């Protein structure tokens, strides 16, 4: 399973539910596209209290043409809740799939890279795409 998708514009998600952060990288965005953070937050507020921090690819409210990377810091995680079940795959979750795919090295806490939290970076990417398409 890849964590990257797309053609002309590539989207890559990264991070784990109980890691330091999750995020998204959008590659090949056109340079000079205006980005309104308030418009993005309208979509992000539909998620938890996820506040994206753009760390590259944006300058003075416009895309630079280089990869745009947004981080969402994980907070209020309770990783110790998973200590007792770390070797027991949960039904209806991707624990076993992650174990097999990554040779037992996947982070199972909170679902790891397969957590529903990884939809937050996709919401950010979708909000960015929506802004772009509205100008076309």
Set out the residue ranges of the language-model regions:
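Generic N-terminal targeting/processing segments that precede catalytic cores or assembly contacts
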Residues: 1-136
């Amino acid at each position: 399973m890849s964590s990257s998708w797309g053609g002309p514009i590539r989207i890559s998600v990264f991070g784990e539910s109980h890691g330091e952060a999750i995020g998204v990288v959008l590659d090949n965005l056109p340079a000079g596209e205006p980005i309104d953070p308030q418009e993005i937050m309208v979509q992000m507020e539909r998620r938890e209290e996820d506040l994206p921090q753009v760390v590259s690819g944006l300058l003075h409210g416009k895309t630079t043409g280089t990869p745009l990377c947004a981080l969402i810091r994980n907070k209020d995680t309770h990783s110790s809740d998973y200590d007792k079940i770390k070797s027991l795959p949960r039904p209806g979750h991707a624990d076993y799939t992650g174990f097999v795919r990554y040779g037992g090295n996947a982070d199972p806490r909170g679902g790891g890279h397969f957590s529903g939290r990884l939809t937050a970076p996709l919401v950010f990417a979708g909000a960015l795409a929506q802004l772009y398409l509205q100008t076309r």
